Every structure is written in C-alpha cells, then in structure tokens.
C-alpha cells in the first residue's frame, strides 16, 4: 500500500517481476481465501498490544511518527520477497495452482505484523486520551430524564 509496487511492479524491472495490477487484490483477498487463512488459528500467535512510548526524543522527532515509519520501512523490505514468490509461482493465483506454504506463512506474518502495529497505535491513543466529559454528561442527562419519566 505504501510503495509504487503496491499493484504490480512499477518502473524499471530488471528482474522481470509481474506488472499484473491484480496482485494487490489477490494478496489481500484471493490468496487468503484460497489458502484458508482464518483468524482462529492465528490467535495464539497474537501478542498483547503494547503502548508506543511517546516520551520526547533527543532528535525532537515525533515518537509516533518515528514508530509508524520504522514499521513501514520494515514492511517495505517484504515487497521484493513477495514478487520473488509470485515469479516462482508460489502465490497460487494461476488456475489449479496451490498456495505454497511459504506464501501462506508470509501473508500470515504480514497480517500479524499489521495487527500488532495497529493495536499498538490504538492502545497508545486510548491510554493517552483525555476523559470524554461530553458523552459522560449526555449519558447523565439521559439517565436523569429517564428517571423522571419512570412510574
């Protein structure tokens, strides 16, 4: 999603990777469905969410920005291995082809890594959020109104 190769190899292509613009949808849906990737078997591999430290950095860069871009850089290193697997026929998109175990494991790990990062962002935001006094006040008013109309 964050490289120019998100939907087929773009630009110079000395290794002859696919330029098929359906690779994105295949990875996000077709491969997972064909390989039978499901949530339940992955759950034991899901670690607890962690809070991203928002402590000021010596370099004065925003800690959340750094955490997100570090994650993206790590994921970018996975782009070429994916295209190598496609070139080797391991993604199972051809009629009658199977999804190889290597490709299944690769996609499962990308899902787990993405979930780990999303959970860290969510937990960090939730823990750092101020109390929602507006909604609490609305709930108190609604409960008070309901109490007045009760028999």
Q: Whereabouts are the PLM-identified features?
A:
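Active-site- or binding-pocket-proximal scaffold segments within functional domains
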Residues: 3-151
């Amino acid at each position: 999603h964050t490289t120019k190769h998100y939907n087929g190899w773009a630009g110079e292509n000395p290794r002859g990777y696919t330029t098929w613009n359906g690779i994105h949808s295949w990875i996000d849906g077709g491969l997972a469905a064909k390989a039978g990737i499901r949530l339940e078997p992955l759950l034991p591999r899901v670690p607890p969410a962690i809070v991203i430290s928002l402590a000021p950095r010596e370099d004065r860069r925003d800690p959340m920005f750094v955490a997100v871009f570090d994650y993206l850089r790590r994921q970018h290193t996975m782009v070429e291995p994916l295209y190598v697997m496609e070139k080797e026929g391991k993604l199972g998109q051809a009629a009658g082809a199977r999804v190889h175990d290597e490709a299944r494991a690769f996609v499962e790990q990308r899902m787990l890594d993405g979930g780990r990062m999303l959970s860290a962002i969510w937990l960090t935001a939730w823990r750092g959020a101020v109390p929602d006094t507006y909604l609490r006040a609305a709930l108190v008013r609604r409960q008070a109104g309901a109490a007045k109309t009760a028999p």
